[in-house]
Every structure is written in structure tokens, then in C-alpha cells.
Regions:
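Extended beta-solenoid/beta-helix repeat architectures
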Residues: 14-99
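Short, intrinsically disordered N-terminal pre-domain segments
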Residues: 1-15
Length: 99
């Protein structure tokens, strides 16, 4: 399952077809096109907050990464925690310089 849960307008949504419709409505086509597994996310003020799950491939355009496994191309956003094995282009919390 690509998406396990999306919290949207304070309401958890767990049915994948409903999650995809929400992502389309908000313009997050890049996330729909990415290869993900068991993603638990929130949408707050038109920003993706990734709480857990796997992002295997695709371009992460912008959002806040709280936790999970990232293997894609990070174009911009805030990386707070998790496993990073992707390519970092720009953003805050560059995982390649962590000690």
C-alpha cells in the first residue's frame, strides 16, 4: 500500500483511493507519482508532513520529513529525522553532513 494514512483537515483518512483524491485536490501529483510504501502523512497549510513510511523513488519537491526511510531525490524541504540514502539537492537539515 502506497499510503497508510493521511491526516487532512484534522481527520485521518485510510482508504487509499480517498487519499489519492485528496493529494490530487491539493496538487501533490509529484507524491502520487513517487514510489512509496506505508506512508503516514499530514497536510497542514498546503505542506506535506511525512511522519513515517518509505519513499523509494521520485522527486521530493517540498515538505517536512519527520521520520521514515528516504531513497529518492530531495529537491527542497526540512529533513528532521529518519534514514536518508537518497540524493540531497537543497533544503534544511542536510543529512549528508550529520555527525
Amino acid at each position: 500500500m502506497k499510503f497508510k494514512e493521511v491526516v487532512y483537515n484534522g481527520t485521518p483518512v485510510t482508504e487509499e483511493h480517498k487519499i489519492v483524491k485528496i493529494l490530487q485536490k491539493e496538487g501533490f501529483y509529484w507524491l502520487i507519482d513517487s514510489e512509496t510504501e506505508d506512508a503516514c502523512i499530514e497536510i497542514i497549510h498546503k505542506t506535506i508532513i511525512w511522519n513515517s513510511g518509505n519513499f523509494y523513488s521520485g522527486n521530493w519537491h517540498y515538505g517536512i520529513w519527520k521520520n521514515g526511510n528516504f531513497y529518492g531525490r530531495w529537491e527542497n524541504g526540512i529533513f528532521e529525522n529518519g534514514t536518508f540514502k537518497g540524493k540531497f539537492i537543497s533544503g534544511i537539515g542536510d543529512p549528508s553532513v550529520r555527525v
